[in-house]
Amino acid sequence: MKADAILAELLSDSARANPYPLYHALHELGPIAPLAEGLAGATPFRAVATGYDVVDQVLRDVTFYKKGLPGRQEHTLLTTFETSMMFTNPPDHTRMRNLFSKTFTPRRLAAIDPIIESVVGSLLDQLEERGAGGATVDFVEVFAAPLPALVMAAFVGIPVEDLPWYQARVRPIDAFLDLNGKQPDVLERADHAAQELRDFYADLIDRRRRDPQQDLLSALIRKIDAGEHQLTDAELISNMIVLFNASFLTTIYLLGSGLPLLLSRPDVTAALPGNEELALDCVHEILRFESPVQFLTRAAPDDVELAGVPVPKDGVVLLLIGAANRDPARFGDPDTFEPGREKLTSLGFGAGPHYCVGAAVSRAEGRIALPRLFERFPELALAGEPVGIGSLFLRGMQSVPVTLG
């Protein structure tokens, strides 16, 4: 089967539930395969990369760039994306990234541990209350989703009472990000949500300027207003929207996808209580095995060859992160979930200049949450089939029914 046909199959419902057989089929074509036709309704990809080394090479190469989205001037969502560091190229990306990198200090990141511990303790209490008497409880609803939302709210400076409203506006934006999401009605809903979030942050920035707090947003504003970094309020708003969304979703899908995997390994769950080092191994292996972000794209700066495959100047390469993290040339027995496997870095947080700026927060959430979860509920068990979110771009669970034992 040619790469074009395999890629077209990835859009089917069955592939969204389990894309890995198709990833294996692409691996058999080599680390990168040319595409003749691209995908109707999406960016016309010129090649698809599944080999770890090729994907890693392109992500680290600063000359490969993010191609602008058509119609971005007419849509609030696309303008938001393209004025954030996640979607820009140097020098704008470098300018924005430097501000966040210098604000995410070791001291600030260390201060997040007590926040996570407090939130985890509260959510474990709620989990116990909802699961009393052997009742089935949705792990995603009660634990995995609230955890990063509450932590990020405290870290960033979003009032906790605004979180339900905020999260409702994140969903239409995520729907647009999928390969099948580029439809006019989906974009219209995402535009509306993006504008509401922009208005929300504009008001919050104004309040933080008048009354600074000990949160990330106040620290960013101080550095900008002191002239240490050049960022407009519009760019700050775009980056806050994208940063919160990315950090929030990564942890939800890390925990939601990870729980069924961990429950398949009772030897691991029995060893997790009190063992944050093992918890970090689990975090890294979950991110490899079920990457929350399944693909990224980059455009070639010139006519180039990648592993012998020609890519023309400005041609877009589809980088299948989920496939690269299952590359048998990189990972031994890649379809086996094995925390503590050889210390090889996955691409779960990306690589290169666009490496996830919130990775340390997500790792800390997993490191703290997993040992405490299985210490509190050693008999935790699945109570039904987990339900996936049904996206190709993002991979995770929307529901994981459990009993507490």
For each of these PLM feature ranges, what is it?
Residues M1-G405:
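Cytochrome P450
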